[in-house]
Amino acid sequence: YLNRTLNLQPEDKMLIVLDLDNFKYINDTYGHQAGDQCLKVIAECLKKAYSRYGNCYRIGGDEFCVLFRKPEKEKYCREKFYWIIEKQKKSLHMLPGASYGSALIEEQESISDTKARADANMYANKKARKQAR
């Protein structure tokens, strides 16, 4: 599935995955139209933060990924993404947070295996964020 969805290029060096926090609550509380609006805003935030160094995709439900060319810029882009999200929350108060994970793309590894590693990092991030509250 991922191989068909993602246009993996030789210059892609890292896979970043993002999963929205408590997105079901937004759909259940405010309706699917509000949920769709949140998804559009998140997609726009991703584009603003990452498009210079990668390609952004929605890969299902409330999950997004970025094929990233410049791993050395990853921390900068991640901080920029979270800053943009916080700025957007001022006008769209129901905007959810996003949990984040990344993995370097290994030459002999399938993209599915890379995604599994990125997912494991993302779920660790999600767990740590919940415990910090």
Question: Where are the language model's segments positioned?
Answer:
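Conserved long alpha-helical elements within nucleotide-processing catalytic cores of c-di-GMP signaling
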Residues: 1-14, 21-48, 57-61, 65-66, ...
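Flexible, nucleotide-binding loop/lid elements of kinase catalytic cores
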Residues: 30, 99-103, 132
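Conserved hydrophobic/aromatic beta-strand scaffold that supports enzyme active sites
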Residues: 15-17, 102
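PAS-family sensory domain
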Residues: 11-13, 54, 98, 131
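GGDEF/GGEEF active-site signature
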Residues: 41-107, 117, 121
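PAS/PAC or PAS-like capping segment
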Residues: 20-21, 71
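Signal-transmission coiled-coil "S-helix"-like helices
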Residues: 126-129
